[in-house]
Amino acid sequence: MVQKAIDFATKVHEGQYRKGTDRPYIVHPMEVGKIVSTMTQDEEIISAAILHDTIEDCEGVTAKMIEQMFSKRAAELVQKESEDKSKTWMERKGATIQHLKVAEREVQMIGLADKLSNIRDIDRDYPECGEELWQRFRMKDKETIGWYYKGVEEALRNSFSEVPAYIEYRSLVEKIFGK
């Protein structure tokens, strides 16, 4: 199932790049899957991690399609990790923080891995780009982006405080945005 998810995600993310870079987008879902695999060996969860942005960011991909190709559970996990793009950035991110506080552990794992992959990119690119880095995002204010990353850190603290991926995430949040 994991290989099938890799193949599908590679196909539907073709031609997409990480914001403000020339890195192929598929690098991100692959990293999210790898991070999740450090927390579970469940192939449905790992596959959902790899597929986590397909409904949200790939034209024509639906939950029904993922259910038919993979499983109902994988489709549900991807759907629970998808944002409502009709809402503002603040509304979406506030909803994500609230959702992660109460979501099932599997959804929290994917959320943690997604945000860890994103903040690793920020940490990697910041020394080269400096403050210009924030211009690549929809929300361009570093302080507001920091509010979001800190909110996610707090939302996941009780469930993951001893998990290496969370410890790395918390450390990068503090490094980039302060305490």
Positions of predicted regions on the chain:
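Active-site helical microenvironments for divalent-metal-assisted chemistry
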Residues: 1-179
